[in-house]
Design a protein with these regions (language model features):
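Basic/aromatic-rich interaction segments and small domains that mediate binding to polyanionic partners
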Residues: 2-4, 10-68
Length: 68
């Protein structure tokens, strides 16, 4: 993902590149979650995303493709 500022990705939907688990332990893959915020944790860039049912999880930028 080659987007440099947080405002460019916040509020946009993304496509998952591999199955991921949300905070409730459910496996997600075919959904397109919305990016809520971008955070840096221990020098790692992460995206907090929210699925249609309200569940959230943190993902690394290489796990998603942010859509226009």
């Amino acid at each position: 993902m080659a987007i440099s500022n947080a405002e460019a990705v916040v509020g946009r939907h993304c496509r998952l590149l591999r199955p991921v688990r949300d905070h409730e332990g459910r496996t997600r893959f075919s959904e397109k979650p919305k990016v809520l915020r971008e955070v840096n944790n221990l020098e790692r860039r992460m995206l907090l995303v929210q699925f249609d049912d309200g569940a959230t999880t943190f993902l690394f930028p290489d796990e998603v493709v942010v859509e226009n």
